[in-house]
């Protein structure tokens, strides 16, 4: 079905200007207002010039478009405003834009951006021409008039108004300055108050509309445009004009109100099959479509109430963060085309506009107060350096005072107390007390000058160190007690077998007297403890002390000669067997966690043991660990010794 009927003329009513007080009394929530503008039908170059429009307006708020699934049906859309193909630039400005400008004078933000497919008339809506100026020149002109009228009002006698402008474009995900082109990608930042700003961007002060024209017209020519099959002057970037209004109080308390107006001309989405883009144009089109897709994701996330809004996924949405779901009074002008060839582009734009009008912003006034008498705030690093230097001066002064105590004390005595009349012992105690108080005062002053967070961290660290010291003291007492008990038992055993030791020593020394000392070879004897008899060994076993025997071992060299004897430690047989039984029981019944409690058994070996046990059954002895892959006999031997020694020491 083709809509060929003439579009209805919409009735345009003048918008009532609301005072700043009434604006301030309004609710803090403001929905994004969406207006749709239909571009006039452009005649085709074919012989058949009968208009074949796919969309038409119903009234000043609604329109209908053919349903592509069933051309006998139409789909209707309702918006805050609809402007037909005969609507003028002034009607659009007065109907949708001018009512948000008074918010700037009370420190609130506002934004106007044009959205739509390529060739739908977005740039014409925002810029216009000398005969029909668009939204940008009309808004700037009226804003200048409003500030002049507000400055001349009696209630604003002590207030001044300053208007500055900056103009940037987002070209292939790079923020470029248009007022002073530098071929440099400018960063986008967010301050502590969640305000979006562009450090390093050029700011120009404008006092009249002539100043604005002087800066804006050359900057607009710096914007990247190119010719495609659908548009002779297609914008290849998103243009963002920022107008900042600063209201400053000249008397105490020196308040400042800052309002920002964003005027944004978005680049249109493109179908490269129709535009015929190649090379650099194809790359530009990809960047444009990607940023517009991110914009649609932001709108969907806001409507669904998702916890994360993907503002940072593109430079465009990062700049529009305040306009969509932020703190600005926002107006979106959706431009559409009536031709059948633009049907799907128009349908997509209308669906996006319908989703955008559900977004709720929360505007608020940005007010700051400046105190003239207040000194300039130091940077944290400078403040730290100043604090350090002052502490060093205090320390040097204290050191010089301590180096000459007599002179300082004499002057103090003359000023406060006559020390000559006091006893020397009393004077000495007073001097010591004064020194202690001075040191304590210095420590408290340093603690008070420390920031709260750092001070709390220091106190917490001090408490932890005190607890650690107490724990170490308790452990030291336990170790000392065990050492004393072991020493007592050892002394008792030595005293009881002193006679047996002397007899044994004489017995071993007697044969040596009859030998020729000139031919005897000196041998090394290792004595860990005095030699004990069987009774001493039995008493030691009863007391539970493990006993190790020293075994003499000779090493044989390659030529058959014996080296000097070395010593090897052998463990008591009963302890060795009981330890092996305990290990064997754990190997046959233990879980992975229990096996890992053994010395030199990790997660991998514990799983190997359980796997071998499931396949081959229980271990018959500990030495069967050699059957496991990667475990040698030497490792099994060291494993047994380590676990038995560990059980004895524990």
From Swiss-Prot:
Ubiquitinated, leading to its subsequent proteasomal degradation. InterPro entries: Kinesin-like_fam, Kinesin_motor_CS, Kinesin_motor_dom, Kinesin_motor_dom_sf, P-loop_NTPase, RuvA_2-like. The keyword ATP-binding applies. It is found in: Nucleus; Cytoplasm, Cytoskeleton. Residues 31-359 form the Kinesin motor domain. It comes from the Eukaryota. Its main location: nucleus. GO terms for molecular function: ATP binding; ATP hydrolysis activity; DNA binding; microtubule binding; microtubule motor activity. One of its GO terms (cellular component) is nucleus. Residues 452-498 form a coiled coil. Keywords: ATP-binding, Coiled coil, Cytoplasm, Cytoskeleton, DNA-binding, Microtubule, Motor protein, Nucleotide-binding, Nucleus, Ubl conjugation. ATP binds at residues 116-123. CDD domains: KISc_KID_like. SMART domains: KISc (SM00129). GO terms for biological process: microtubule-based movement; mitotic spindle organization; spindle elongation. The keyword Nucleus applies. Belongs to the TRAFAC class myosin-kinesin ATPase superfamily. Kinesin family. This is Kinesin-like protein KIF22-B. It comes from Xenopus laevis (African clawed frog). The lineage of its organism: Eukaryota, Metazoa, Chordata, Craniata, Vertebrata.
């Amino acid at each position: 079905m083709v809509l060929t009927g003439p579009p209805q003329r919409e009735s345009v009513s003048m918008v009532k200007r609301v005072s700043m007080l009434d604006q301030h009394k309004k609710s803090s929530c403001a929905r994004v207002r969406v207006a749709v503008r239909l571009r006039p039908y452009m005649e085709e170059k074919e012989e058949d010039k009968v208009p074949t429009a796919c969309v038409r307006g119903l009234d000043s708020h609604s329109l209908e478009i053919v349903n592509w699934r069933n051309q006998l049906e139409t789909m209707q859309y309702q918006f805050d405003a609809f402007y037909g193909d005969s609507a003028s630039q002034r009607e659009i400005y007065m109907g949708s834009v001018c009512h948000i400008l008074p918010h700037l004078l009370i420190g609130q933000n506002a934004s106007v951006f044009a959205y739509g497919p390529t060739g739908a008339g977005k740039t014409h809506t925002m810029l216009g021409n000398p005969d029909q100026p668009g939204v940008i020149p009309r808004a700037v002109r009226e804003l200048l008039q409003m500030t002049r009228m507000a400055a001349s009002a009696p209630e604003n006698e002590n207030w001044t108004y300053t208007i500055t402008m900056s103009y940037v474009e987002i070209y292939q995900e790079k923020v470029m300055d248009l007022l002073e082109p530098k071929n440099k990608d400018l960063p986008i930042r967010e301050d502590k108050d969640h305000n979006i700003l562009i450090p390093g961007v050029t700011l120009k002060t404008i006092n009249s509309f002539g100043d604005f024209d002087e800066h804006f017209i050359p900057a607009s020519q710096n914007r990247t445009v190119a010719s495609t099959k659908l548009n002779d002057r297609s914008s290849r970037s998103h243009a963002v004009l920022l107008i900042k209004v600063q209201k400053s109080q000249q008397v105490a308390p020196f308040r400042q109100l800052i309002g920002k107006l964003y005027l944004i001309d978005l680049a249109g989405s493109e179908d490269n099959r129709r535009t015929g883009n190649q090379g650099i144009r194809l790359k530009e089109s990809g960047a444009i479509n990607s940023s517009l897709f991110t914009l649609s994701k932001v709108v969907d996330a806001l409507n669904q109430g998702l916890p994360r809004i993907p503002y940072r996924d593109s430079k465009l949405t990062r700049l529009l963060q305040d306009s969509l779901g932020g703190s600005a009074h926002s107006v979106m002008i959706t431009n559409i085309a009536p031709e059948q060839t633009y049907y799907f582009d128009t349908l997509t734009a209308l669906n996006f506009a319908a989703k955008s009008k559900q977004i709720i912003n929360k505007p608020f006034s940005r007010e700051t107060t400046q105190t003239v008498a207040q000194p300039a705030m130091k940077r944290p690093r400078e403040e730290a350096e100043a604090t350090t230097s002052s502490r060093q001066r205090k320390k040097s002064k204290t050191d010089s005072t301590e180096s000459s105590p007599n002179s300082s004390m004499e002057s103090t005595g003359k000023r406060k107390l006559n020390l000559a009349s006091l006893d020397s012992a009393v004077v000495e105690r007073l001097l010591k007390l004064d020194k202690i108080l001075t040191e304590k005062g210095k420590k408290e002053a340093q603690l008070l000058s420390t920031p709260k967070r750092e001070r709390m961290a220091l106190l917490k660290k001090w408490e932890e160190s005190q607890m650690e010291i107490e724990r170490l003291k308790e452990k030291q007492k336990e170790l000392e007690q065990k050492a004393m008990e072991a020493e007592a038992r050892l002394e008792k055993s030595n005293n009881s077998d002193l006679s047996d030791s002397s007899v044994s020593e004489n017995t071993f020394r007697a044969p040596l007297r009859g030998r020729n000392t000139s031919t005897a070879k000196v041998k090394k004897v290792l004595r860990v403890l005095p030699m004990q008899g069987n009774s001493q060994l039995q008493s030691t076993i009863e007391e539970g002390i493990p006993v190790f025997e020293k075994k003499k071992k000779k090493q044989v060299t390659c030529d058959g000669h014996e080296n000097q004897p070395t010593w090897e430690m052998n463990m008591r047989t009963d302890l060795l067997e009981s330890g092996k039984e305990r290990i064997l029981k754990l190997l046959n019944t233990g879980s992975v966690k229990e096996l890992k409690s053994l010395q030199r058994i990790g997660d991998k070996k514990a799983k190997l043991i359980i796997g071998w046990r499931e396949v081959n059954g229980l271990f018959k002895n500990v030495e069967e660990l050699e059957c496991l892959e990667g475990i040698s006999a030497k490792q099994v031997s060291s494993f047994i010794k380590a676990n038995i020694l560990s059980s004895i020491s524990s």
